[in-house]
Amino acid sequence: MANKKIRVRYAPSPTGHLHIGNARTALFNYLFARHNKGTLVLRIEDTDTARNVEGGAESQIENLHWLGIDWDEGPDIGGDYGPYKQSERKDIYQKYIDQLLEEGKAYYSFKTEEELEAQREEQRAMGIAPHYVYEYEGMTTDEIKQAQDEARAKGLKPVVRIHIPEGVTYEWDDIVKGHLSFESDTIGGDFVIQKRDGMPTYNFAVVIDDHLMEISHVLRGDDHISNTPKQLCVYEALGWEAPVFGHMTLIINSATGKKLSKRDESVLQFIEQYRELGFLPEAMFNFITLLGWSPVGESEIFSKREFIKQFDPARLSKSPAAFDQKKLDWVNNQYMKTADRDELLDLALHNLQEAGLVEANPAPGKMEWVRQLVNMYANQMSYTKQIVDLSKIFFTEAKYLTDEEVEEIKKDEARPAIEEFKKQLDKLDNFTAKKIMGAIMATRRETGIKGRKLFMPIRIATTRSMVGPGIGEAMELMGKDTVMKHLDLTLKQLSEAGIE
């Protein structure tokens, strides 16, 4: 195996959108392949037809591309080892099912689901771990054939089970976990390799595919550890060498310490959800790669090229990776600060249009206004959809201050500062950020009020917010009419509150 070319695979099931955990598996396999100048194979494992979602494969492929992951072979681009959808490989699987049946390493099982469940219930009652019990124990070959013929005559459809040898230890040196071993009597008995509908089970099909596609390394989540001894059983039955395995730790919710579950609605878990919020693909790539893998040094922001250069599976963590939403927001903010402004404009415009704040085809002048709005908030946003809430003041009619804002203004010498600032603004012909800041400085000179006592009342009176972007830029975008209306309303409200 050491001399073989590196070939890895990412093999999702088309059961829905691309999950954070699956995206991490894809990223680690991608980085491992690119670091070693190897091959990444995309394979669609769609044998569980009951769980398949229409368009699921296409959705996952699109989101993988969005993240910046490409592959060398797959259902969309072909390759020498196809087909790359398991549903198109049934004849291939049947060949090896037949081989194991002919060699006596597998057999037809006619036990019904009801009989199997009754068997499991009985075992639980006895305090025994549920497992399959060989149904032909003590029978001759002729007796087995007769029993199977009678079952077929009754219209029963069989599954195919593989024999689990007794007293065998299945072991491997895991890239992440180290040496692991399972005794054959802990697997649960002879397991199904072909279902009643003729489709192979996961643990059988994956072995056939990995062997025929010459996969050298299998990097996947550690929820697959219990599958590995079953797969090693199939490898041994067919006389094949197994690939190198590496099982990555689970991802946990940093807020709860529990495994990141699709049922946990406190965390967004699908790549498509982050796309809709306006997260950047480079930031998602960066953040997800650091979920369970540690680069050299203290830096947390890396380019794809740097990740490829550094990636070493030996640095995969043995402890669960914590998914921290605030950390993701911070990482995305770092990327937004240096992102192409046209890219941010496109994302934010989509968010504003979706919220009904900007029309579908804005005129050039309106587009320039939106561009200034986006540039103003770019460093403040964790993702572009935040612009909808941050910029509401620019899309609403002049309104009264909130009680909280009134209380804040009462702390300072608000009225004289606001009255003088209104006079200074009234003199302006060109309502630009530079001129507005000049008006604030003139207010300072005329009133002697300075620092927070000057800036906070003016900010609250004009923008209806105690925090925000540069006050001059914000007022320029609001326009003189709106700002003056806000100042008039503020002075009226202060009078009503008895603040002179």
Curated annotation (Swiss-Prot):
A motif ('HIGH' region) lies at residues 12-22. The keyword Membrane does not apply. Keywords: Aminoacyl-tRNA synthetase, ATP-binding, Cytoplasm, Ligase, Nucleotide-binding, Protein biosynthesis. InterPro entries: aa-tRNA-synth_I_cd-bd, aa-tRNA-synth_I_codon-bd_sub2, aa-tRNA-synth_I_CS, aa_tRNA-synth_I_cd-bd_sf, Glu-tRNA-ligase_bac/mito, Glu/Gln-tRNA-synth, Glu/Gln-tRNA-synth_Ib_cat-dom, GluQ/Sye. GO terms for biological process: glutamyl-tRNA aminoacylation. One of its GO terms (molecular function) is zinc ion binding. Belongs to the class-I aminoacyl-tRNA synthetase family. Glutamate--tRNA ligase type 1 subfamily. This is Glutamate--tRNA ligase. It comes from Lactobacillus delbrueckii subsp. bulgaricus (strain ATCC 11842 / DSM 20081 / BCRC 10696 / JCM 1002 / NBRC 13953 / NCIMB 11778 / NCTC 12712 / WDCM 00102 / Lb 14). The gene is gltX.
